[in-house]
């Protein structure tokens, strides 16, 4: 079949590599537009506020689609029912396209009401209107992505996302430059219009790929006619019954952002800031802190995406042991990603801000507070993917909802008292609560105790050791008056090298675990040479 299937770890690394590229392009354009004095933190506030509302509607309308379809399709593919898998795809395309159109129209025509009456920030209206058509294209792309991932083909999923981000980055900068003589809210709307352009391009790419392989797909479908095909109505009910609880987690995540929109802007004004200053302070969180924290989250999302179809297929074949093994391995790698990222951002927050935002370097202290959410959010991503793969689709949403309620209460009480540092703290608390509950639920279902030493303690020891090296290198370079840009880059590179060495020295990854990686044998040879040195 033309739609090629990849192994679990190859699929993970394809998605992971694409996410790294996406974040690189995302960083570039966000840093560029933030450094325009006309845009800066105020523009980021309008941009980020609009995106939070858009993300919420997108979560309700589309977020459960890829995982739902990949789960149902992978179950059919595991037993050879390619005809049933394709009917799931066709039904989903009709159903979710209709839902997306309704939400897009609601956002476009309700933009003024939302911005004035809910957000108390009238300038967000134009951002919401420019984002609304993107919901339709994202929904249709999500159906196609879910179909390909369900067949364990991660390549086209990843290519489409990279293409989308490249186009988004280019057009965002172009539109902002074209609108430099206008107000920050209009520039923010221009930048978000690029999202709609990019989403339509990604959908077109996936559609072309599907049509290119349509003949081969139909040939495979005809070979599986021995299977009974469910009715469209039955499939639609099944899609909705899975999509709603899977979306619930994403909806709650998006709601946590909206909680900040509703509580923080109002709280900052009660704290004593005027509307413009409150927008600037909130813009630091949305436009700087959030995008830096998002890097490790986007890299690790590969495990969440790949685990759902893999576990579903393994369970359909009655192979629970294999599924559990992949979960433990994924959790360990998630720890290896999250811990050094959090510590690195904490130690280098100020030099990183000076490097990336030379024209608007304020806010490093907020990153130092909020960066600890990375640990809990990254690990939680993997936990949610595992729970959904096992069919425990309501649990992630419930865990997140409990954390969101606590976050809302803390924001309402403490933002008017202590200002912009509060949402940074409550974001950490929110993710800690959700992650802890999901962890308990997963291992209770698996009926086994987690190996804390292997999963967390060894990666933590390697991370702490890396932290000492980071401090020493940075202090040394400051002492000999190396400029901040060169200092920061050298320190980050030294930290990465040190971390790899400590992972090898402390035997954080076993040889058989390394061999599961693409080019695992070659990596093992390199690690063995490091041990000898």
Predicted regions span which residues?
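Helix-loop junctions and terminal segments of transmembrane helices
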Residues: 63-78, 297-319
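Interfacial segments at transmembrane-helix termini and the short loops linking adjacent helices
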Residues: 112-130, 346-377
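Membrane-interface junctions at transmembrane-helix termini in multi-pass inner-membrane proteins
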Residues: 138-160, 372-402, 413, 417
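Membrane-interface helix-loop junctions in multi-pass transport and translocation proteins
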Residues: 155, 166-209, 394, 402-439, ...
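Membrane-proximal transmembrane or re-entrant/amphipathic helices at the cytosolic face
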Residues: 472-533
């Amino acid at each position: 079949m033309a739609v090629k299937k990849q192994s679990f770890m190859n699929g993970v690394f394809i998605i992971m590599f694409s996410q790294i590229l996406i974040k690189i392009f995302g960083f570039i354009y966000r840093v560029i537009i933030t450094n325009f004095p006309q845009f800066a933190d105020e523009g980021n506030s309008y941009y980020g506020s609009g995106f939070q509302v858009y993300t919420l509607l997108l979560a309700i309308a589309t977020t459960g689609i890829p995982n739902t379809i990949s789960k149902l399709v992978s179950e059919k593919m595991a037993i050879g029912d390619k005809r049933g898998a394709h009917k799931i795809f066709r039904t989903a395309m009709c159903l979710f396209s209709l839902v997306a159109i309704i939400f897009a129209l609601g956002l476009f025509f309700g933009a003024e009401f939302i911005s004035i009456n809910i957000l108390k920030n009238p300038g967000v209206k134009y951002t919401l209107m420019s984002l609304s058509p993107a919901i339709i294209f994202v929904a249709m792309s999500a159906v196609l992505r879910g179909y390909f991932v369900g067949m364990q083909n991660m390549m086209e999923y990843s290519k489409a996302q990279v293409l989308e981000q490249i186009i988004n980055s280019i057009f965002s900068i172009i539109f902002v430059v074209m609108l430099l003589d206008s107000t920050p809210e209009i520039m923010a709307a221009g930048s978000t219009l690029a999202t709609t352009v990019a989403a339509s391009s990604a959908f077109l790419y996936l559609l072309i790929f599907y049509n290119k392989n349509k003949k081969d797909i139909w040939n495979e479908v005809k070979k599986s006619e021995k299977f009974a095909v469910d009715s469209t109505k039955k499939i639609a009910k099944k899609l909705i019954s899975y999509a709603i609880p899977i979306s619930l987690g994403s909806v709650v995540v998006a709601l946590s952002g909206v909680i900040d929109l509703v509580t923080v802007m109002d709280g900052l004004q009660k704290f004593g800031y005027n509307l413009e200053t409150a927008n600037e302070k909130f813009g630091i969180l949305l436009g700087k802190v959030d995008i830096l924290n998002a890097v490790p989250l986007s890299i690790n999302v590969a495990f969440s995406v790949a685990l759902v179809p893999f576990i579903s297929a393994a369970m359909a074949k009655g192979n629970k042991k294999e599924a559990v093994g992949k979960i433990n391995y994924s959790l360990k790698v998630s720890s290896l990603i999250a811990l050094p990222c959090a510590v690195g951002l904490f130690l280098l927050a100020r030099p990183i801000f000076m490097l990336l935002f030379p024209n608007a370097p304020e806010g490093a202290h907020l990153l130092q507070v909020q960066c600890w959410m990375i640990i809990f959010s990254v690990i939680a991503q993997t936990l949610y993917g595992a729970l959904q793969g096992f069919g425990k689709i309501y649990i992630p949403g419930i865990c997140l909802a409990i954390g969101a309620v606590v976050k809302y209460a803390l924001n309402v009480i403490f933002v008017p008292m202590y200002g912009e540092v509060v949402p940074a703290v409550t974001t950490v608390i929110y993710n800690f609560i959700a992650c802890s509950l999901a962890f308990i639920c997963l291992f209770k279902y698996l009926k086994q105790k987690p190996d804390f030493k292997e999963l967390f303690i060894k990666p933590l020891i390697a991370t702490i050791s890396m932290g000492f090296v980071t401090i020493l290198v940075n202090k040394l370079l400051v002492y000999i008056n190396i400029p901040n840009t060169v200092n920061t880059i050298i320190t980050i590179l030294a930290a990465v090298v040190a971390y790899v060495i400590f992972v090898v020295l402390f035997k954080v990854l076993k040889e058989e675990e390394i061999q599961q990686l693409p080019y695992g044998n070659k990596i093992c040879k390199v690690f063995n040479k490091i041990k000898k040195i």
